[in-house]
Amino acid sequence: MKAIISLLLISAMVFSVIEAVPVEEGLQLFEGERGCLPHNRFCNALSGPRCCSGLKSKELSIWDSRCLG
């Protein structure tokens, strides 16, 4: 029983540390990895629904996506 309570407390602490990083800051950290190119408003096809600077990604084809405001 003590092990379960300890595990729950550790999980809660880890979650609170992860939540301490603001979402916007987290998105900025991974913007380069997603291949966002804000100067021409294109996004990487693998970036999914998220895109550069909070823009939404619209798939024009399987290989081409454009960031829309």
UniProtKB/Swiss-Prot annotation:
Does not contain a cysteine at position 57 which disrupts the cysteine framework. Residues 21-34 form a propeptide. It is found in: Secreted. GO terms for molecular function: toxin activity. Expressed by the venom gland. The modification Leucine amide is found at L68. Disulfide bonds join C36-C52, C51-C67. Residues 1-20 form the signal peptide. Keywords: Amidation, Disulfide bond, Neurotoxin, Secreted, Signal, Toxin. GO terms for cellular component: extracellular region. Insect active toxin causing rapid but reversible paralysis in crickets. No activity shown in mammals. Does not show effect on mammalian voltage-gated calcium channels. Belongs to the neurotoxin 01 (U2-agtx) family. This is U2-agatoxin-Ao1k. It comes from Agelena orientalis.
